[in-house]
Amino acid sequence: MQEIESLHQSVLLQEVLQAFTPLEEGVLIDCTLGLGGHSKALLSQKPHLKLIGIDKDKFAQEIAKERLKAFEGRYNLLSGGFAKRFKEALETHNKEIKGVLVDLGVSSLQLDDDNRGFNFHSHTLDMRMDLKSDLNAQKVINSYPVVALEKIFRDYGEIKEYKKIAHKIAERRAKKPFKDAKDLSDFLSSLSKNKKIHPATLVFQAVRIEVNSELEELKEFLQCARNLKGAILCVISFHSLEDALVKNAFKDYAKNCICDPSSFQCTCSNNHALGAILTKKPITPSPEEIKNNRRSRSAKMRVFQFKP
């Protein structure tokens, strides 16, 4: 456990604590509990706060449970996708919920585990957050039709040469299926000379999003979050696709006028805002945090305060 404490660094930890400063009691939902770093800090700082922690990774949840031992009786951990579990919690605890945290990053424990398939050197091609899920990265890469690969590379990886890469993968797998993440990573490296980022980065991102239905789950969550009352919602994203969804959802929450944009005059009474955006621009890690934890460099945090 001491090793986990030293290796795991929660992204934007001080900024998260600052965002939830007004919270003194009630329930906080950590929708992506991970190893429990943010939750542990919040429970330590706020003795009257209770926690509902959600994660689909059973292994990570076991570690989080051990780390939260000192707060026995103040937390309840749930397994499963966060959109579904959040909706259930909202139905039963709506008046008690004072804060909601969503950290959309992959934990260092998952990234560094060669048996999970998230990193370029893994000896599996998996990428599942939920190990009970039927779909894994190997099925996507070795079985998806070329048209489907093109779509996920274009939409989830924002890859310019999405057609070329999809066709090259199809040509290669017809001769010899990809056996693990290293095999795929080495192959992608042979196709590109891009030195700014590893050639496999965007393909791995796209496949991971597909395997875990990440954007669909985020959309479902953001739609459900509209029903929050008096709560602070804090979302940390790690790439432009996630951040755009969060940014647009927050703008939508803050709209006073809900008339058709083509209308010449407002007829809706112009008072429909669900609350206020607390971050005009996203909060990003300090240079010092990036220096200490390079994986934090793409993090962006947005915060919204819902009306009671």
UniProtKB/Swiss-Prot annotation:
The top EC class is transferase
For the ligand (S-adenosyl-L-methionine), the binding residues are: 36-38, 55, 86, 103, 110
The Enzyme Commission number assigned here is 2.1.1.199
Catalytic activity annotation: cytidine(1402) in 16S rRNA + S-adenosyl-L-methionine = N(4)-methylcytidine(1402) in 16S rRNA + S-adenosyl-L-homocysteine + H(+)
Where does this polypeptide localize? Cytoplasm
Q: Name one Pfam family in it.
A: Methyltransf_5
Q: What is an example of a GO molecular function annotated in this UniProt entry?
A: rRNA (cytosine-N4-)-methyltransferase activity
Q: What are the BP-aspect GO terms?
A: rRNA base methylation
Q: Which UniProt keywords apply?
A: Cytoplasm, Methyltransferase, rRNA processing, S-adenosyl-L-methionine, Transferase
Give the family, as the similarity comment puts it. Answer: Belongs to the methyltransferase superfamily. RsmH family.
Write out the function statement from the record.
Answer: Specifically methylates the N4 position of cytidine in position 1402 (C1402) of 16S rRNA.
Q: What is this protein called?
A: Ribosomal RNA small subunit methyltransferase H
The organism named in the record is Helicobacter pylori (strain HPAG1)
